[in-house]
Structures are given as C-alpha cells and as structure tokens.
Regions:
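Short, glycine/acidic-rich hinge or "gate" loops at secondary-structure transitions
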Residues: 1-10
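Conserved helix-loop functional segments at active or binding sites
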Residues: 1, 50, 54
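Short gly/pro-enriched beta-turn/loop segments at secondary-structure junctions
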Residues: 55, 59-64
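Sequence/fold signature of self-assembling virion shell proteins
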Residues: 15-18, 22-50, 63-66, 72-175
Length: 175
C-alpha cells in the first residue's frame, strides 16, 4: 500500500484524526477519506491553517506548500493548480486554491512510487519528515579472475521517519 499505518512517537499513525496534544487532539487527515477535487483540496488548505495545534493546544502557523500525487492524479493536480479560473466550471470565478492560505507555493509533485492511485498528500511549511542517510551509497568493483567479467556491487543504509506529524496532511480514499 501507499501508506504505512505503523504508529509514531505520539502513539498513532502519521496521518491520523487523533494526534494527542495536551487535553485534546488534532487531525492531519479528513475524518472521511476523500478523493482529490477542488472542494477537498480547499478543505485541506483550510484545515491545515485552522486546525493544526502545538502541544499546548495553541494554533500554529501552518500552511500547505506542496501537493504530492500518484501518476493517476497528475491531470487532476494540473487542473487544480495551474488554472487561473475555477477548474471544471463555466464560471469565470477565480481559482480560490491559488489564493487560499497563500495558495500552494511549490505546486505539485508526482511520485511514481506511490502504490495507491487515489491517495494524495499535502506537505506543509512545518519541518517534520526525516530521511536519515546512515551510510551513503558506495560502490566497489573488481574483475573476476576466472571469467574476466567485471563484478560491481553497491551498498547503502538509510531510513525514513517523522518527528512532527504537522509536516503533512494526507487522504487515502479507496476509489
């Protein structure tokens, strides 16, 4: 699957409706998982801006900055983030996605390795996703004495984790 629901340091999955804070919780995923469209993207932008809280329950300055999509949702991402007028209508209303909460300043990115064709994510301006490069990629080679073939090998150790779930908002619809 695209999403690994293993629990993090706060005892819940990375994208959860119940991240614990002092006496309450906050969500970085919709209560009901939703497909990507104009309304759900606007709701995500507003939810990030209004619902993200710190450990004391105080509002933090959080804004969506980049949309992460599987290849199947790239056309939807283009329509939502690249049009000046409201997508999918004959109205000449402005595209609110481009202005709400500062818009999506870094646009979208297509991740070819997401295995769900429907899940989508919004990275925020808050640091919290971690890539730990424990041993950088190294290669070695030698010529096989018997066959005269060139033998090569590569080795690397790394891991991914998170330390602040406010770094991402995600939705995982099944269709």
């Amino acid at each position: 699957t695209t999403y690994n629901s293993n629990v993090g340091g706060d005892g819940v999955a990375l994208c959860s409706t119940a991240h614990p804070i002092d006496g309450s919780t906050y969500a970085n995923t919709p209560t009901t998982q939703v497909d990507l469209n104009e309304a759900t993207l606007l709701n995500a932008q507003i939810s990030i801006r209004t619902n993200f809280r710190d450990q004391a329950g105080l509002k933090v300055f959080a804004r969506g900055k980049k949309l992460i999509l599987p290849p199947a949702l790239e056309p939807v991402g283009i329509r939502l983030t690249k049009t000046e007028l409201r997508p999918g209508t004959a109205d000449n209303d402005v595209n609110a996605i481009l202005s709400t909460a500062g818009g999506i300043p870094e646009g979208y990115m297509v991740m070819d390795f997401l295995t769900s064709s429907f899940a989508w994510y919004m990275l925020t301006n808050i640091a919290g996703l971690a890539y730990m490069n424990r041993i950088p990629f190294e290669t070695d080679m030698q010529v096989d004495f018997v066959t005269d073939n060139l033998l090569t090998k590569g080795y690397q150790r790394f891991s991914y984790n998170y330390f602040n779930p406010r770094a991402i908002f995600g939705s995982f619809p099944t269709s």
